[in-house]
UniProtKB/Swiss-Prot annotation:
Disulfide bonds join 24-42, 35-59, 63-74, 75-80. Shows cytolytic activity on many different cells by forming pore in lipid membranes. In vivo, increases heart rate or kills the animal by cardiac arrest. In addition, it binds to heparin with high affinity, interacts with Kv channel-interacting protein 1 (KCNIP1) in a calcium-independent manner, and binds to integrin alpha-V/beta-3 (ITGAV/ITGB3) with moderate affinity. It comes from Naja atra. Gene3D superfamilies: CD59 (2.10.60.10). This is Cytotoxin 6. Expressed by the venom gland. One of its GO terms (biological process) is killing of cells of another organism. Belongs to the three-finger toxin family. Short-chain subfamily. Type IA cytotoxin sub-subfamily. Its main location: secreted. GO terms for molecular function: toxin activity. Coiled coil: none annotated.
């Protein structure tokens, strides 16, 4: 009985992921990385002249402002920067 209870506690801890971390796509979407502590946004960066293809993707702490040449799109859920 104690073994069953211990197993349930361990499974619960693993499933809850107590130290939640964000996962963001890298430049090639099938590949993603787990963001470091404090990096709570995913981002996608485009060149304004060619918005069809992102130049960079990853984790970031603050979403940068877009400029005349570069556009940033940020989000805060797992792998949302497709």
């Amino acid at each position: 009985m104690k073994t069953l209870l211990l197993t349930l506690v361990v499974v619960t801890i693993v499933c809850l992921d107590l130290g939640y971390t964000l996962k963001c796509n890298q430049l090639i979407p099938p590949f993603y990385k787990t963001c470091a502590a404090g990096k709570n946004l995913c981002y996608k960066m485009f060149m304004v002249a060619a918005q069809r293809f992102p130049v960079k993707r990853g984790c970031i702490d603050v979403c940068p402002k877009s400029s005349l040449l570069v556009k940033y799109v940020c989000c805060n859920t797992d792998r949302c920067n497709n």
